[in-house]
């Protein structure tokens, strides 16, 4: 070994001796295996209970009408029902067959041809797609009102007027009965005057009074409530009706009633003014009247001459009637200052149309008031209005 190699070896040894002694290597203990973490239980979503079933729909009551008697008023009541959207389910008339009913309803010499569709199908009268059962029973007790749903019955024959006579409709299934004439004992109502007195719990049969009472009573109500009526006389100049003769013939009631309707002005009796006392009790015994039957087919006029409790100028009377016609009696009482004549009121639906220019006053206490009415069409519309009102009051 050379001297140089010895030196290098010694240096290397010295260097090795000077290095720190390495720490003994400690083997790390193995970590214990990770314990599985408990998984949170899944949140159970609460399922809401099913909604309750919807309540059963309330059965909507529907007004249905039956008509007994298909004469002037019966046919016009059907027209009024069609115009007002009232459902007619049956017509009874023993003297008119189905085909003739179609003809009579379609054509009218006074009010013109019916503007809708009229036909018959499968034994029914069909008006504007409304199917109407037709019966030909001679007695009210025979009419099967139950079979068509127990309607409100319009008694339009002019024959059955009393409670005893018309209760047969109820026994046959009618729900209520409205008599299209004054009745000797049935409660009497005039729309716009006393309909609020109707009691559905005790009144199944009522009277719609007469066409003349329907004209006079609204007028008398306005005047009496504002100015007071001490006493009065009424005259109605009335168109001829089906009960009169086209030529002279026999009459049991009064001889001159049998004279030709087209040829004469015929004085006649009327209970219309006295009947006002039944619908306005405060006027009982204060009004009476008479009629002149004249040669016109339709539209009549009332002349009420009365003594007032409160001195009142005629202008104030006009103002009171005009206000009522625009307010609480709209559709029933009307007001005009036009130069009108009877044919201007053909097919007018009002009960009473006050003619402001035709009336006169002797002084502030004594006046003559004039009011027109279509004794057929206006009256028939009030019949339907009374039926609708009664239905609205029934529970």
Curated annotation (Swiss-Prot):
Pfam families on file: Gp_dh_C, Gp_dh_N
One GO cellular component, as annotated: cytosol
Matches recorded under Gene3D superfamilies: Dihydrodipicolinate Reductase, domain 2 (3.30.360.10), NAD(P)-binding Rossmann-like Domain (3.40.50.720)
Keywords of this entry: Cytoplasm, Glycolysis, NAD, Oxidoreductase
Molecular function terms from GO: glyceraldehyde-3-phosphate dehydrogenase (NAD+) (phosphorylating) activity; NAD binding; NADP binding
Involved pathway(s): Carbohydrate degradation; glycolysis; pyruvate from D-glyceraldehyde 3-phosphate: step 1/5
Record PROSITE patterns: GAPDH
Site for Activates thiol group during catalysis, residues: 238
Region (Testis-specific N-terminal extension): 1-60
Record-listed NAD(+) binding positions: 72-73, 93, 138, 375
Leading EC class: oxidoreductase
Main location: cytoplasm
Active site per database record: 211
Family per similarity comment: Belongs to the glyceraldehyde-3-phosphate dehydrogenase family.
Name recorded for this polypeptide: Glyceraldehyde-3-phosphate dehydrogenase, testis-specific
């Amino acid at each position: 070994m050379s001297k140089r190699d010895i030196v290098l070896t010694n240096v290397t040894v010295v260097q090795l001796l000077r290095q720190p002694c390495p720490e003994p290597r400690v083997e790390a203990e193995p970590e214990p295996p990770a314990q599985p973490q408990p998984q949170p239980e899944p949140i159970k979503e609460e399922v809401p209970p099913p909604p309750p079933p919807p309540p059963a729909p309330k059965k909507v009551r529907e007004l249905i009408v039956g008509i007994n008697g298909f004469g002037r008023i019966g046919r016009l009541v059907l027209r009024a029902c069609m115009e007002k959207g009232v459902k007619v389910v049956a017509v009874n008339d023993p003297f008119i067959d189905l085909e003739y009913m179609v003809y009579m309803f379609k054509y009218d010499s006074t009010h013109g041809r019916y503007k809708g569709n009229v036909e018959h199908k499968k034994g029914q009268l069909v008006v504007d797609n409304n199917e109407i059962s037709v019966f030909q029973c001679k007695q009210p007790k025979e009419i099967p009102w139950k079979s068509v749903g127990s309607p409100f019955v319009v008694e339009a024959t002019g024959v059955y007027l009393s409670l005893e006579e018309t209760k047969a409709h109820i026994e046959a299934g009618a729900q209520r009965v409205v008599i299209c004439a004054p009745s000797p004992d049935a409660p009497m109502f005039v729309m716009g005057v006393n309909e609020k007195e109707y009691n559905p719990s005790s009144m199944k049969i009522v009277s719609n009074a007469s066409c003349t009472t329907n004209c006079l009573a609204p007028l008398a109500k306005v005047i009496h409530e504002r100015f007071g009526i001490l006493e009065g006389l009424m005259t109605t100049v009335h168109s001829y009706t089906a009960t009169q003769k086209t030529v002279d013939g026999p009459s049991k009631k009064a001889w001159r009633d049998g004279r030709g309707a087209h040829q004469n002005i015929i004085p006649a009796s009327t209970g219309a003014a006295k009947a006002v006392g039944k619908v306005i009790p405060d006027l009982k015994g204060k009004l009476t009247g008479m009629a002149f039957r004249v040669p016109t087919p339709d539209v009549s006029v009332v002349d009420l001459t009365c003594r007032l409790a409160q001195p009142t100028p005629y202008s104030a009377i006009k103002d009171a009637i005009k206000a009522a016609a625009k307010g609480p009696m709209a559709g029933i009482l009307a007001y005009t200052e036009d130069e009108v004549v009877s044919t201007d009121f053909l097919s007018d639906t009002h009960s009473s149309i006050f003619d402001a220019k035709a009336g006169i006053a002797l002084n502030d206490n004594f006046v003559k008031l004039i009011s027109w009415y279509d004794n057929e069409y206006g009256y028939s519309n009030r019949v339907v209005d009374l039926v609708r009102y009664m239905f609205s009051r029934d529970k």
